[in-house]
C-alpha cells in the first residue's frame, strides 16, 4: 500500500506540472487521489499498449526511489506484468477502505463512475473486479439516442454525491451520440481545524500577486504552536495545519520570494516533498500565522493533458484496447472530466460548526511569522497512508 501511495503522490506532482504549463499565474486545484482512483478503474479493463501507457502515467511501473538508466527503465516497464496489476487493485481496495473510514471529525466523500454505451456488453470478470476492488459498477446508458439527458443525469448524480458542491461537472455539448465511454470523478471534503481561527481576528489585508500587483483579501490570523519545516533550495518555508483528529493535514509551501512559486514548482519532486514534510524535518514553533480565506473551484477536461503525459491510446478509437472490459472492438475513453472544490475559512474547509480542541504545549519554543500573503502551494494529505488527496496552487484568492 505504501508504494501505491507513492505512485499517487508522484502522479499528483507530474499532473500539477503539466497543468501549470497552460495555467501560468492561475490557481490550480484538483484531487490527485480521486483522479488516480477513477483512472485505475479504467486501467482494470485495459490491455496491451493501452495498459502499459496508463501504468506509466499513473506511475505504477516506476521503482520507488530507484534510479536507473533510460534503457533499463524502458525494459523494466515492458516487463510490468499481470501480478503487479492485480496487486495494485488489491492495494487500492485497502487504501480506499482506510481513507474513507467513517470519522466524526471530518466528511470525505468520493464520486467515481464509468458510463458506457449500453450496446457494449461488459465482461462479468470486469464487473466483479470493479465491485470487489472499487465498490462500483459501470452504468449502461443510451448515448446514441439520449446523450444530453445522460449528461444531465450524470451531473445530478455527482451533485448529490458531493453535498451539492460539485455542480455541472459535464459542460454543455461535452456528450453526444458518438460518445462511447465517460469517466467522471469528484471528491468532497469537509473538515474542522484542530485549532480554529477566531473570526474576530480576520481582517482585510493585501495579498501580493506579484511585485507590482496586490488585491485585498480576508486574512485570518492565529498565534499557536505549530509545525514548521524549512526548504533550502529554492528558499521556502512550510507549515502543517492539522485537522481535528490529526488524520488529515493541510501542508503549505510558501516561497521566500514573492515571485518564487514557479521555481519551487519546477524543483519539487516526490522524493523532495517526502523529505521536506517528514516528521524529522518538522520543528515546533510559536507561529504567528496569517492565512487568507479562499474558495477554489476548478474544472478540467483531462483528455489532452493525460494524452500528452503518455496515455494517448486510451482516447483513440482505433488504438484503445479495453478488451479486459468488453469484447467490443471500438470501445475507447471519450473524456475524463474532473472538478474539485475547496473552501478554507476560520473553522476549516467549508463552513462547519463545532469548536476545535485546544492543546497547549507548555514548553519554550522559537517564534516565527508565517505570512501567506503571496502565491503558495498547498496539499491536503491523509497522514496515516501519506497520500495526497488534494493538490493546490493559490496565485490569487
UniProtKB/Swiss-Prot annotation:
Family annotation (SMART domains): SERPIN
Disulphide bridges, residue numbers: 68-395
Motif Nuclear localization signal in this chain: 74-77
Subcellular location: Nucleus; Cytoplasm
GO cellular-component term (any): ficolin-1-rich granule membrane
Keyword Coiled coil: no
Tissue: Expressed specifically in myeloid cells and the bone marrow.
Coiled coil: none
Marked site (Reactive bond) residue numbers: 362-363
Molecular function terms, GO-annotated: serine-type endopeptidase inhibitor activity
InterPro entries: Serpin_CS (IPR023795), Serpin_dom (IPR023796), Serpin_fam (IPR000215), Serpin_sf (IPR036186), Serpin_sf_1 (IPR042178), Serpin_sf_2 (IPR042185)
Family indicated by similarity: Belongs to the serpin family. Ov-serpin subfamily.
PANTHER family xref list: SERINE PROTEASE INHIBITOR, SERPIN, SERPIN B10
Summary of the function given for this chain in its UniProt record: Protease inhibitor that may play a role in the regulation of protease activities during hematopoiesis and apoptosis induced by TNF. May regulate protease activities in the cytoplasm and in the nucleus.
Protein name (database record): Serpin B10
Originating species: Homo sapiens (Human)
Highest classification ranks of the organism: Eukaryota, Metazoa, Chordata, Craniata, Vertebrata
Gene: SERPINB10
Amino acid at each position: 500500500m505504501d508504494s501505491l501511495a507513492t505512485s499517487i503522490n508522484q502522479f499528483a506532482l507530474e499532473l500539477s506540472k503539466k497543468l501549470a504549463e497552460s495555467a501560468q499565474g492561475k490557481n490550480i486545484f484538483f484531487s490527485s487521489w480521486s483522479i488516480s482512483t477513477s483512472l485505475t478503474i479504467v486501467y482494470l479493463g485495459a490491455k496491451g499498449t493501452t495498459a502499459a501507457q496508463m501504468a506509466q502515467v499513473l506511475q505504477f511501473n516506476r521503482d520507488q526511489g530507484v534510479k536507473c538508466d533510460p534503457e533499463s527503465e524502458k525494459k523494466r516497464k515492458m516487463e510490468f506484468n499481470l501480478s503487479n496489476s492485480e496487486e495494485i487493485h488489491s492495494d487500492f481496495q485497502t487504501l480506499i477502505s482506510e481513507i474513507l473510514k467513517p470519522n466524526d471529525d471530518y466528511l470525505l466523500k468520493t464520486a467515481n463512475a464509468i458510463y458506457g454505451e449500453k450496446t457494449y456488453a461488459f465482461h462479468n470478470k470486469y464487473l466483479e473486479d470493479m465491485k470487489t476492488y472499487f465498490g462500483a459498477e459501470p452504468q449502461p446508458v443510451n448515448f446514441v439516442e439520449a446523450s444530453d439527458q445522460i449528461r444531465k443525469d450524470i451531473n445530478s448524480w455527482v451533485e448529490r454525491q458531493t453535498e451539492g458542491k460539485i455542480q455541472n461537472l459535464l459542460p454543455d455539448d461535452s456528450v453526444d451520440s458518438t460518445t462511447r465511454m465517460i469517466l467522471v470523478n469528484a471528491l468532497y471534503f469537509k473538515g474542522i481545524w484542530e485549532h480554529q481561527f477566531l473570526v474576530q481576528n480576520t481582517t482585510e489585508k493585501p495579498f501580493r500577486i506579484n511585485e507590482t500587483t496586490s488585491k485585498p483579501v480576508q486574512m485570518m490570523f492565529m498565534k499557536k504552536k505549530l509545525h514548521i519545516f524549512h526548504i533550502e533550495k529554492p528558499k521556502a518555508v512550510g507549515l502543517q495545519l492539522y485537522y481535528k483528529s490529526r488524520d488529515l493535514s493541510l501542508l503549505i509551501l510558501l516561497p521566500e520570494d514573492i515571485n518564487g512559486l514557479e521555481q519551487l514548482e519546477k524543483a519539487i519532486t516526490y522524493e523532495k516533498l517526502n523529505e521536506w514534510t517528514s516528521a524529522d524535518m518538522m520543528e515546533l514553533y510559536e507561529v504567528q500565522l496569517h492565512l487568507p480565506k479562499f474558495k477554489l473551484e476548478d474544472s478540467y477536461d483531462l483528455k489532452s493533458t493525460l494524452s500528452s503525459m503518455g496515455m494517448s491510446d486510451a482516447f483513440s478509437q482505433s488504438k484503445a484496447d479495453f478488451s479486459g472490459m468488453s469484447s467490443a472492438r471500438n470501445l475507447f475513453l471519450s473524456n475524463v472530466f474532473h472538478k474539485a472544490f475547496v473552501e478554507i475559512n476560520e473553522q476549516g474547509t467549508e463552513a462547519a460548526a463545532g469548536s476545535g480542541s485546544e492543546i497547549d504545549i507548555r514548553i519554550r519554543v522559537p517564534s516565527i511569522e508565517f505570512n501567506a500573503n503571496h502565491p503558495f502551494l498547498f496539499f491536503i494529505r491523509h497522514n496515516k497512508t501519506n497520500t495526497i488527496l488534494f493538490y493546490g496552487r493559490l496565485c490569487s484568492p
